[in-house]
Amino acid sequence: MQIVLISGLSGSGKSIALKVLEDVGYYAVDNLPATLLPELVAELSDTGHERVAIAVDVRSGASLLALPQQVEHLHALASDLRLIFLDARDDTLIARFSETRRRHPLASEDVSLAEAIQSERDALASIAELGHRIDTSELHANTLRAWIKDFLAIEATEGLTLMFQSFGFKYGIPLDADLVFDVRCLPNPHYDLRLRPFTGKDQPVIEFLDSFPEVGRMCEDIRRFVATWLPSYARDNRSYLTVAIGCTGGQHRSVYIAEWLGRHFSDTLRVLVRHRSAARRIVDHGADMADK
């Protein structure tokens, strides 16, 4: 049996993730108390279900504390067990709840939204370390759907997948980054008005950055560092290693370098390249992500 556990903060997109799994053929169960996991899995196994997706979150109350132990128990019941933890920055979660006017499950007359988010983050801290974390702070719902599908495809294979992720420091460092490189010291195409509308994937920006030797040295230095330490990360039984490349706005330099690194590692490894901030102007932080 294949089991995917979904957890994370309220408003981070758990309902979207669960619906993606349901759409691709998983039997989906939402808001299950953690203590009932073994019983449910045993029953579904007896009735012939081969793929199951279960959402477990803070609404489970005190039973949530049992989840780490239940995960260990489920490894004995499932041939393939994965856990996805969805996260987002506090300001993003506050904006999503404010825009949709949904109530946070831990908020009350005496507990503000910000306090409720912090309480939930504290309660889920140990669970966040159990699985693959996805920071949805800058993700549109359609992008999250694509990332979940990528995760399912990658996890079905053996070995480590290397993800290069560009971002803008002005929007915050991605919560799911394992390694972070700051490339704001490089020449900035933003100050050339002709280049400003483009991204680091467009030829005019590529030619601009290619003309500076320090850009090539930065790319090579990052490549060498990742290549040197990649075997150590792989020995840690990881499925993913997320390398985040940041510039000021996440549109030009970081995109260029993430693409460069992706090309140079793709001959020998499974590689994904993602750009968090390059299309930020079309990102919707509100209604479609504030699920519950």
UniProtKB/Swiss-Prot annotation:
Coiled coil: none annotated. InterPro entries: P-loop_NTPase, RapZ-like, RapZ-like_N, RapZ_C. GTP binds at residues 57-60. ATP binds at residues 8-15. It holds the Pfam family RapZ-like_N. One of its GO terms (molecular function) is ATP binding. Keywords: ATP-binding, GTP-binding, Nucleotide-binding. Displays ATPase and GTPase activities. Belongs to the RapZ-like family. HAMAP family: RapZ_like (MF_00636). NCBIfam families: PRK05416.1 (NF003828). This is Nucleotide-binding protein AZOSEA20610. It comes from Aromatoleum aromaticum (strain DSM 19018 / LMG 30748 / EbN1). The lineage of its organism: Bacteria, Pseudomonadati, Pseudomonadota, Betaproteobacteria, Rhodocyclales.
